[in-house]
Amino acid sequence: MACTTILVGKKASYDGSTMIARNDDSGSGHFTAKKFVVVQPEEHPAVYKSIISHVEVPLPGNALRMTAMPNAVEGKGIWAASGVNAANVGMTATETITSNPRVLGADPLVVYQPARDGQPEVPGGIGEEDIVYLVLPYIHSAREGVLRLGKLLEEYGTYEMNGIAFQDVDEIWWLETIGGHHWMARRVPDDSYVVMPNQLGIDAFDLDDAFGAQENYLCSADLREFIRDNYLDLSLDGRLNPRDAFGSHDDADHVYNTPRAWFMLRHLNPNTWVWDGPAADYGPRSDDLPWCMVPERKLTPEDVKYVLSSHYQGTPFDPYASYGDKSMKGAYRSIGINRNDFMALIQMRPDVPEDIRAVEWIAYASNAFNTMVPFYANVERTPAYLACTTGEVSTDSFYWVSRMIAAMADASYARSLIHVERYEEGVLSASRALLNQYDKNIASAEESQRAALREEANTAIAAELKKRASDTLDKVLFELSSGMKNAYARSDA
C-alpha cells in the first residue's frame, strides 16, 4: 500500500506513551472500504491460506484476541492492517518500501506462479495481505513480533518490499524487508520519532549489535554474508548505510517519497535545520533526510494527526494554495491524500491500569478533511458506527460519512474548511473529555465492572462522533450545493 508512517518513542511523547501511526492508502484510482473490528481467538484457522500468493502457513494454537482494520468487502484477503492484541502489543503493517536491482537480483522476491503447461502452481511468499494476521495474535512484546515475522520471512519469503512497526509500552521496533528472504529491524530510540514515506528508511545499522547483544538491532541470520557476497555496502568508511545498500534514490522518490519525510521533519523540528531555500540543510528532494530525530518539544496524538493529514501547508507545494507563486503547486505527493483509507494511531499509555493502557485513534478517508477518535482497544466488540462498513454507501457508516465529507469539502474548500476545522476540534475535545472521565471511572471500578465500562465508553464516544459527523456532513453539503453552477441569485417573489 502507498502509506505514510510516524513512530514516537516514549520519552518523545507528551505523557510517556509509545505511539505508532500509519496512513493506509489505496493505490491511484482505487478506494478500499475499511472497518474497525475485534478478531476473537477462535476465528483463526489451524492453517492460514493467502488469497494473493496461495501460500499456506500453519498457525500456533494459542491466538490472542486482537483488534484489526480489515477490508470491508470480502474477496481479496483480510488485510488486517493495524491492531492491538490482548497482551497490549500494537502492530501496523505495512508501509510499502523500495529496493534496488542489486538486492532483488541477489535475493529475488517470492512471487506466486500459477499452474501452466501441466506444471502445478508455485505459491508465493507472505505480504501485506497476511502479515498482521500471521503475527499479532501470537506475540507478547514488540521484540517478539520482530522475531516471529523475521522467522516467517526467512522460511516463506515475501513477494513485496515492506516496513512494519511493533510496539509495547516500553519499546517500538521498525522492521524492513530486504529482497525475498532477508530483513533488518531497529529499535526506535526512546527520545526520538521516526518518519517513513514509501521508501526504505533505516540509515544506520550496527551489525555487531545485531549479531551480539541485540539491544537495538536485529536482522536475518545471514545478513552479514549477504551484504559481503553481493557487494552491497557502498560506504567508503565501513559504516553501513542500509538506505544506500538496500534502498533507492530514484527520480520518483524525489516527487513521491522524500518530500513527505521532509515536510514532517520540517514541521516537528522547524529550528533544528534550515529546511528551505538554496542554503537549506535538507530539501524535499534530499536523499539523506534523517530516519529519526529528537523533537524540539514533546509530541501529542494531535501532532501525529496533523503531519499525517498534511499537504505541504505554508509551502509552494500545497495543492490548495490560493496565493503566491503557484508554479510548484501540487508538485509533490501529499500525505493527506484523497485515497487515504484510514489512519490508525496506537497509543500505549504507561500511567493507567493495564486494561485501559491501549487506545486506538481511528480516522477514515482523506485525512485533510477528517477527524480521528480514540477507543479503548481491550474490548470484545467495537461500535457499529466504525464496524458496519460494507461496499454500500451509507450515512450509518463512519467510513462512508468521512468519504462524503472529504469529497464535498475538497470541492468547496474555501467555504468548507472552517466546518472541517471545527468538526475536528470538537470531536477531539469531546472524545478526550469522555476518555478522561472513563479512565477515572474504570480505574476506581470493581474488576467485574471494568469490561462493560470500556465498551460503554467506546459506545459513548461513537455516539458523540456520529452526531458531530452528521452535522458536518450537513454543513459541507450546504456549502457545495450553494456553489453549484446552476445557482441563481434571484428567488421567487
PLM ranges: what are they?
Residues V132-Y138:
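Short, well-ordered beta-strand elements within core beta-sheets of diverse protein domains
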Residues E225-D351:
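Glycine-rich, aromatic-lined ligand/substrate-binding cores of catalytic
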Residues Q313, F317-S444:
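Substrate-recognition/cap regions that form aromatic- and gly/pro-loop-enriched pockets
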Residues A2-E128, R148-A280:
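A contiguous strand-loop segment
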Residues Y138-E144:
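Short, charged, surface-exposed loops that flank catalytic or proteolytic processing sites
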Residues E424-A493:
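Histidine-centered catalytic/metal-binding microenvironments
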Residues P60-R65, V146, S322-G330:
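Short Pro/Gly-enriched beta-strand edge/turn motifs at strand-loop
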